[in-house]
Amino acid sequence: MSTVAPPSAQNVQGATSREFRHDINGLRAWAIVPVVLFHFGVPGFSGGFAGVDVFFVISGFLMTQMICRALWNGDFSLMGFYLARAVRIVPALVVVCAVLVAAGWFALLPPDYKMLGAHTAYSLTFLSDIAFWREAGYFDTSSHEKWLLHTWSLAVEWQFYLLLPLVLMGLARVTRSAHAWGRALAALAAVSLAACVWTTASNPSAAFFLIHTRAWEMLAGGLVFLAARTATYSPGRRRLIEGTGLVLIAAAILAFDAESAWPGWRAVVPVAGAALVLLASRESVWTGNRFAQWIGLRSYSLYLWHWPVYVFLAYIGLRFNGLALAAGVVASVVLGALSYTFVENPSRRALRKPRLDARIATLVGAAACVALCAAGVWRSNGVAGRFAPGVELAAAAATDVNPERARCHQSAGSTSPACLFGGTERKLFVVGDSHVAAIISSVVDAGPRGAAGVVQLSYDGCVFIPGMLQIRPHRFGANADCKGFTDWAAKQLDAAPTLPVLLAGRYARYAFGPFELDRDVAKPEVYFAGQPETTTTPAFLREFGRHLTETACKLARTRTVYMMRPIPEMPASVPQYVARRMAWGLDPSLSVTTAQYMQRNGWVWQAQNEARDRCGIVILDPTATLCHDGVCSATRSGRPLYSDYGHLDEFGAHLLVPVFARMYQPAAPGHSGGTTFSAR
């Protein structure tokens, strides 16, 4: 059984050298450049997010090296290790957070400022990964609106820093065998990888953000360090190992994209690539060139600043503007360089001299000061009153939603609370996706007071069409969730075969993808049989429409079926767009033409018309209320009608009460359905 000796006594090949590792510094450039270019939408870097995985491997390697050396020498200090990590990470992070909180006072609307305050506090306490995981969901603010979203990876690394020395110290008390240490870390890595693969399929948000599904990537770096202690390779073999690693990293960047379930098994590709480059321990033109070395030194500050720059461009509506994005990349590099020169380096020098307790007090005090200010911003709801009342009223539309949504609208599992509104007797089912949750209170208000008897069956990203499967399970949950909910909802309807049903949903989203400003997406998010379509074709729309018609007609055999025309989608989040434009003194009007609306929804109308003509279903048309003279406006008298891109807020939904009231009116003599109702 081999024993662990000090590094000087080992046959070490660079991996444990106390000298600066230029290959590691260059590998940092291979990590940060793809991340930045991916976020700024540069073609060819669709999998640039894999750079974060490369960073994780590097961190695991360096931390294992640092701790093992100190344990071998008998001078390891747990508090000293934690302090060294804090000196490396905290100062630049505090500056970024402080700048954002200060600038936000002047520029951010109360809802946005409140969110920034919460995220700042979480970031400075290294809990942002948990916060973003808990926030993740269909109604979550878009990622490009979260100024500190990128700090999730810092939180994961810090949590790893807290745990790794405890694990290694525990192993050192049990055995001095380096092989035993390696086997223990390998076992932990295997468990973490298994959890990662399983959780990516079952709970993708947790797999992406949390430490237990990411630890294996950092442990992989630690295993490389332990393996490299006694490894010897010829120059040719080292060149081959490094080349293979760089190819794997490049392959991950080129082959994967935002649609890829991540991390899962796919993350093995960049992790293995980074591990091989570290194992090779070779200075080459790929990692040793001046550009890679310059970027590598500034990679941490560049990572900290690039995302706020991108969010700023998104905030002012320029995230699809090529010239603005190019300027954003340049600005990120400049800010990263300034941070490295004036924050990172000076803080390291300044915090190297004082006593341990003084350094701890300085770091904790600075972080606590900014975190407490940020928490105050959150507690005060974004400090309302900084803008004109009309601006803040428009911004508040984002939270003008049904207060029962969280309780009655489902986003996981395969059932629903089946909330009953307006009385104790079931009289009407309302079934569909999140657009049901947006209109449900108005459906209830349209009925007899206290006797509407409305049952809500709604699920995130899942319109009621049996047999429909989701192409992107990592976004909305596994296919089985939507299918399971649809099967369950069908049983609920079958148990009451004569009760009327209202079907509603954002069908265009599933057929074409999102509808956003300056971007035209035509990629289905669902399929029905066989292989999913990669683009939205006329044949796919016909198939989708056929399933929609057949679903309605099957229900109409024993009951009255109502189908609501789709709500017009807007090309931007309405409360944010309107409030920001008002605050900046610009025209806040936002709308789509009926031609644009029909371009995405005409096929839905055709399917609904066919169901009306064939099966006597009744169509409820909100566009007669929401659209006038060929234009569907996002506001009414300057007030937003939507809480986001496509969901009506309570104010907007209330305008449709006359439309829904038709469901509660007795049919005319001799009438058997097949009608379209609207109201102006």
Which positions does each model-derived feature cover?
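Extracellular/periplasmic envelope-modification machinery, especially enzymes
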Residues: 2-6, 258, 318-324, 328, ...
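Membrane-interface helix/loop caps of multi-pass membrane proteins
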Residues: 2-355, 679
